[in-house]
């Protein structure tokens, strides 16, 4: 279908958008105003780690009812769409070509499945080829349709940073997955974090920020120690003033390993816990 700004189906999220397209072509649906949405973008030539994290974040967000927006490119975009579908959620692909063209062809399955559980969206008419100049343009629509933008992996001059810039101009929150210093695929994300982007440590963290699903700081009736209200307090209480090995902290906290590690990292960043040597922690005095 074709919709214009005068159409009642036109996304309110696009109102006031700088360079608003004169129309949109849609196969399937567009996000409604009540729908919580996250854009997950990143490198086409991503690492195995990037693929895994894009899929993981998208799947968990989708399971919690958050729809995933991306660009159906190879790499991070494709894995984000696939993760959302695997999580039983909705996903939307903003294309840099006409609706009648599947680009890249390797994503044919996504091209066919996404309209059944979301939609394909483009400002380019049928027959429009996937020209290089189209992709930076479509990025402004990706960010505009999202409540929050997550960059998973990006080089220093990645197109994903264009999406992040658009998001900031539009007043959206931007988060990035941290990576190893010196890793080319992490330079863009680490740069965003250095410039003030949020640190994406887990899907649960982003769900809490978006007010969707169970957040990190919600209390858990099963995992309480001395009446502690949150998992964060629980983990902190398991760290002593003397060095303590990780396996002992895990045993006492009785939380999933990845959750405990995530909270320990947060506590380190806050200056409340030190990793005195590998897998050994103590409270900072």
List PLM regions with ranges:
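Glycine-biased, small-residue-rich flexible motifs in mid-sequence functional cores and linkers
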Residues: 2-285
């Amino acid at each position: 279908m074709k919709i214009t700004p005068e159409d009642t189906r036109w996304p309110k999220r696009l109102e006031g958008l700088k360079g608003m397209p004169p129309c949109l072509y849609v196969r399937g649906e567009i996000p409604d105003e009540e729908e919580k949405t996250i854009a997950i973008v990143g490198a086409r030539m991503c690492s195995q780690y990037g693929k895994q994290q894009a899929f993981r974040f998208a799947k968990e967000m989708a399971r919690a009812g958050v729809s995933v927006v991306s660009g159906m490119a190879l790499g991070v975009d494709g894995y984000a769409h696939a993760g959302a579908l695997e999580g039983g959620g909705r996903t939307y692909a903003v294309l840099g070509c006409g609706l009648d063209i599947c680009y890249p062809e390797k994503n044919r399955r996504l091209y066919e499945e996404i309209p059944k559980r979301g939609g394909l969206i483009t400002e380019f008419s049928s027959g429009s080829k996937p020209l290089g100049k189209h992709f930076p343009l479509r990025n402004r629509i990706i960010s505009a349709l999202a409540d929050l933008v997550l960059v998973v992996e990006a080089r220093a001059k990645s197109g994903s940073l264009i999406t992040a810039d658009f998001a900031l101009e539009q007043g959206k929150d931007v988060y990035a997955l941290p990576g190893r210093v010196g890793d080319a695929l992490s330079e863009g994300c680490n740069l965003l974090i250095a410039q003030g982007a949020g640190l994406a440590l887990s899907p649960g963290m982003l769900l809490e920020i978006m007010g969707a699903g169970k957040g990190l700081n919600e209390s858990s009736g099963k995992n309480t120690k001395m009446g502690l209200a949150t998992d964060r307090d629980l983990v902190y209480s398991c760290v002593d003033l003397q060095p303590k090995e990780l396996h002992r902290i895990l045993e006492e906290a009785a939380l999933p390993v990845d959750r405990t590690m995530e909270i320990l990292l947060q506590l380190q960043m806050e200056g409340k816990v030190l990793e005195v040597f590998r897998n050994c922690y103590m409270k900072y005095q």
